[in-house]
């Protein structure tokens, strides 16, 4: 018997908080077409993700993947840092 490989959901967003230990808050923005008016509207969602090495800083663009629940609100893990935030 061969088992089908399960696809893992991944999302890309911007880190808006890194104040927690080994956790980050990622803002995911998407554009959705309004069902009645047809206008494209920006919607956003904040997801908490696990950052094992505490590498992320505010402003970084990251990719996160869905995982098992790690806490009450955290069920995503950091896959990679796409782009570092510029230091001013």
From Swiss-Prot:
Provide the assembly information.
Part of the 30S ribosomal subunit.
Annotated keywords = Ribonucleoprotein, Ribosomal protein, RNA-binding, rRNA-binding
Q: Does the keyword rRNA-binding apply?
A: yes
What is the name of this protein? Small ribosomal subunit protein uS17
Give the matching InterPro entries.
NA-bd_OB-fold (IPR012340), Ribosomal_uS17 (IPR000266), Ribosomal_uS17_bact/chlr (IPR019984), Ribosomal_uS17_CS (IPR019979)
**Its job:** One of the primary rRNA binding proteins, it binds specifically to the 5'-end of 16S ribosomal RNA.
- A Pfam family: Ribosomal_S17
Q: Which GO terms describe its biological process?
A: translation
Which protein family is it in? Belongs to the universal ribosomal protein uS17 family.
Coiled-coil annotated residue ranges, if any: none
Molecular-function annotations in GO: rRNA binding; structural constituent of ribosome
What taxonomic classification does the UniProt entry list for its organism?
Bacteria, Pseudomonadati, Pseudomonadota, Gammaproteobacteria, Cellvibrionales
Q: Which GO terms describe its cellular component?
A: cytosolic small ribosomal subunit
The highest taxon in the source lineage is Bacteria
């Amino acid at each position: 018997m061969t088992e089908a490989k399960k696809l893992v959901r991944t999302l890309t967003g911007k880190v808006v908080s890194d104040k927690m230990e080994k956790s980050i808050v990622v803002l995911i923005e998407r554009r959705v077409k309004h069902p009645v008016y047809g206008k494209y509207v920006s919607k956003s969602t904040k997801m908490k993700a696990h950052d094992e090495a505490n590498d992320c800083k505010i402003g970084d663009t990251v990719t996160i993947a869905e995982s098992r629940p790690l806490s009450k609100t955290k069920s995503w893990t950091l896959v990679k840092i796409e782009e570092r935030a510029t230091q001013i």
